[in-house]
Each structure stands twice: as C-alpha cells, then as structure tokens.
Swiss-Prot record:
Protein name: Large ribosomal subunit protein uL22
General function of this protein: This protein binds specifically to 23S rRNA; its binding is stimulated by other ribosomal proteins, e.g. L4, L17, and L20. It is important during the early stages of 50S assembly. It makes multiple contacts with different domains of the 23S rRNA in the assembled 50S subunit and ribosome.
InterPro entries, A to Z: Ribosomal_uL22 (IPR001063), Ribosomal_uL22_bac/chlpt-type (IPR005727), Ribosomal_uL22_bac/org-type (IPR047867), Ribosomal_uL22_sf (IPR036394)
Keyword check for Iron: no
Gene field: rplV
Length: 117
C-alpha cells in the first residue's frame, strides 16, 4: 500500500534579494501554522516578505491540489534560504579604479506539512 504524503514543497529560485536579508523573514514563519505565517508576512515591512509570502501560498496550493491536504491543518515544517548565483558588477571610483559590487540572489524553499494531532 502506498504511504500517504503529508507534506508539500514550493521554491523560488534565483530571486534577486540577498540571502542574509531573506533569512530574517523566513526565520519568523518557521514552525507556525500557515494562517499565522501569512498574517506575519503581510505585516512584516521587509523586501523579502512578499517573495516568501508568494512561495508559502504556492506550497499551500501544491498541498491542496496535488495531495488533497486541508489547508487548515497545515504548518510550515521547513523554511530555508540558500545562496543562488551572484551577479558581479563594478562601480567606477576615483583615479581610474573600480570597486566590486556583488548582487546576490537567493533560493527560497518552504515545506508545509499536516499537523499530527
């Protein structure tokens, strides 16, 4: 007999935000119920909040559509941000010199699971 799948995953790859900044937002929702996590994200004034919110909504939709899980029973079991490719640029400086600019990207991953009551 096939094992019942009780979690769903969503990820956004190569998002143009520094991983260090995105992790601040992701740390707020880890372990929370999806309703509470969405509320937290809507009132968090950080650039990463809408990105993480979109990934969370995608994970919830994946759970409902692909695995027939009830969204009321879901919580954020895993949420992490990995470093993506870095875009390297240069800023011209005085005396013909240049300073490097690293435009960092992130891979945002959110996994939602059913609560075992």
């Amino acid at each position: 007999m096939a094992e019942q799948i009780s979690s769903a995953k969503a990820e956004a790859r190569t998002v143009r935000i520094a991983p260090r900044k995105a992790r601040l937002v992701v740390d707020l929702i880890r372990g929370k119920s999806v309703a509470e996590a969405l509320a937290i994200l809507q009132f968090t004034p950080r650039a990463a909040s809408p990105i993480v919110e979109k990934v969370l909504k995608s994970a919830i939709a994946n759970a409902e559509h692909n695995y027939d899980l009830e969204s009321a029973n879901l919580y954020v079991s895993e949420a992490y941000v990995n470093e993506g490719a870095t875009l390297k640029r240069f800023r011209p400086r005085a005396k013909g010199m240049a300073s490097p600019i690293n435009k960092r990207t992130s891979h945002v991953v959110v996994v939602v699971s059913e609560k075992n009551d």
